[in-house]
A protein has these predicted regions:
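An N-terminal domain-cap segment
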Residues: 1-3
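An acidic-aromatic
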Residues: 6-54, 124-125
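Short, surface-exposed charged micro-motifs
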Residues: 6-8, 23-24, 69, 99-103
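Short, functionally important structural connectors and interaction interfaces within domains
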Residues: 19, 52-56, 62, 96, ...
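Flexible, surface-exposed loop/linker segments and immediately adjacent secondary-structure boundaries
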Residues: 47-82
Length: 156
């Protein structure tokens, strides 16, 4: 099975706004708001102390610093860019992930691609096709406004 989807994410510190598969997820630093327009539903949740809070784009760029052993892998030319892959092997053998391949753009020194190989052989690829840095955002960009969603069911 091959399936491709795209989305956008904006990250500032620990706060983020993710738009993916028709839904929006917003983390304002304290709570996560997941808006699903198809169902007209909003779920609001708070992370517990020390909890890994599921998808967290703000951790995407440094998740590998703990819990993985790593080694150099292949270097590829991708669309004129030199991408150096690093193989990340989970320290915990009971993980559902066999290994990850983290592709680094050598010139930009940024993550270009993340490939996850599951213990069951499933392959998931995330490609960061465009990254903008040091952009100005409105002060309320990461603020949830319930009035923008009239008639939505809000699940606390």
């Amino acid at each position: 099975i091959k399936q491709e989807t795209s989305g956008t994410v904006t990250v500032e510190g620990s706060r983020y706004k993710l738009m993916y598969l028709g839904a929006e997820q917003l983390f304002d630093g304290e709570k996560t708001y997941t808006v699903v327009p198809e169902n007209e539903e909003i779920t609001i949740s708070s992370p517990e102390e020390g909890e890994d809070f599921g998808i967290n784009p703000s951790k995407l760029l440094n998740f590998y610093k703990e819990g993985y052993d790593y080694q150099w892998d292949i270097k590829q030319n991708v669309l004129g860019r030199t991408i150096q892959f690093v193989k990340l092997i989970p320290s915990d053998e009971n993980k559902e992930v066999s290994y990850l391949l983290l592709g680094i753009d050598v010139l930009k020194k940024s993550i270009y691609r993340l490939i996850e190989i599951g213990a069951n052989g499933t392959r998931t690829t995330l490609t960061l096709s465009n990254q903008l840095t040091n952009i100005s955002l409105a002060t309320d960009y990461f603020k949830f406004d319930a009035s923008s969603y009239p008639n939505y069911y809000i699940n606390n």
